Amino acid sequence: MDKFVKLTGVAAPLPVVNIDTDMIIPKDYLKTIKRTGLGTGLFAEARYNEDGTPNPDFVLNKPAYQNAKILVAGDNFGCGSSREHAPWALLDFGIRCVISTSFADIFYNNCFKNGILPIVVSQADLDKLMDDANRGSNAVLSIDLEAQEITGPDGGSIKFEIDAFKRHCLLNGLDDIGLTLEKAGAIDTFEKSTAASRPWA
């Protein structure tokens, strides 16, 4: 998993509340267990017309936001089913950070396991960031995870809170496998000790 220390990129505004995982990645894209290639299905029902052509009115199809790295979204983002394909699709598109006033718990935790930083802010701060995101190609935000700070295009900053353990994992690029490998030495020592003390086991 890639480390997340600092991120600077265009932020796309998506001022919709209760965006569920079915909206993020429709069920038609759940047949694969590969994490790559799902970016094409991200928000597919809103992003494409019935004939499969891109919907020019959808934010991520607009030239200024086609390479967005940050999503500023409405309340209760990621609700619905627990499909891990949702953060996979966001990451494959290039989104490394989602900012909202709240997230569904399972989606929130899945983000950290896949290298995405979900940031919870107040409604007032979200309104300010949504205004920033509406600046098109000038909608550049900087996220500093070490300082726990968001800096807007005008230089103003917003602090955010994050669980210390989750922060550690993102800063060091540690998913569940990485966390286990961090303890490889201790695991090996334990196994050798157990084998020596219980040769019959």
Curated annotation (Swiss-Prot):
Record-level Gene Ontology MF annotations: 3-isopropylmalate dehydratase activity
GO biological process: L-leucine biosynthetic process
Catalytic activity, as annotated: (2R,3S)-3-isopropylmalate = (2S)-2-isopropylmalate
Entry GO terms, CC: 3-isopropylmalate dehydratase complex
Top-level division of the source organism's lineage: Bacteria
Pathway: Amino-acid biosynthesis; L-leucine biosynthesis; L-leucine from 3-methyl-2-oxobutanoate: step 2/4
Keyword annotations of the record: Amino-acid biosynthesis, Branched-chain amino acid biosynthesis, Leucine biosynthesis, Lyase
Enzyme Commission (EC) number: 4.2.1.33
Any Pfam family hit: Aconitase_C
Subunit structure: Heterodimer of LeuC and LeuD.
Main function: Catalyzes the isomerization between 2-isopropylmalate and 3-isopropylmalate, via the formation of 2-isopropylmaleate.
Family, similarity comment: Belongs to the LeuD family. LeuD type 1 subfamily.
Name this protein carries in UniProt: 3-isopropylmalate dehydratase small subunit
Gene: leuD
